[in-house]
Amino acid sequence: KMQKGYYYSSNRDPELLESADHIGAMAATRTEQKLGAKKISTQRLPIVFSSRVAPGLIGHLLSALSGKSQYEKTSFLNDSLGKKILPSFVSISEKPHIIGGLASTNYDSEGVTTYNKEIVTNGEIAHYILDGYSARKLDMEPTGNSGGVTNIRINHNDQSLAQMISPISKGLLVTELM
């Protein structure tokens, strides 16, 4: 069955972009890794998500922590400040002032000063992501996030993918989501 894969490079400095040859080779490798894929039966298995799946998962998490989702009560994480939602080894922070960062900014789209913040600390929700309107609706202070989050950083355990999957005799490695 035909498969497709992708790979890309992004940077503010064009000189730091990966070469077209490397990008093509990585896309080809990822495509080849999908050959022979097949459905599995329903079962309970340990799951490991590859790092390239993380942005999508983290994006859904951050959306659930947005002020709008909170005041509209449409989030699967309603009223979750201080609650543990992830393993203790996971922390998620926002660093809006990284020099050369793709999304670095001193102010959000409402003119509120941005600042470093922990969104999730040791698996617990530390901050919602608030613009001025949602902050007022929730009787909280704006977090400098009108227009979204910037330069998200995820602290996690230092194991490589190979180290994470080596103790698993039968499991599922998720490399892409639909």
State the predicted function of each range.
Residues 1-61, 65, 127:
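Internal alpha/beta scaffold segment
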Residues 4-7, 72, 99-100:
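General secondary-structure edge motif
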Residues 8-14, 65-72, 134-147:
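Extended active-site and interfacial segments that coordinate phosphate-rich ligands
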Residues 9, 19, 50, 66, ...:
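Alpha-helix initiation/capping motif
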Residues 24, 80-178:
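Dual-mode signal for accessory low-complexity, basic/Gly-rich regions
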Residues 32-43, 69-73, 172-177:
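Residue-level signal for secondary-structure boundary elements
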Residues 36, 54, 67, 73, ...:
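Glycine-rich, flexible loop/turn motifs
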Residues 67-86:
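Amphipathic alpha-helical
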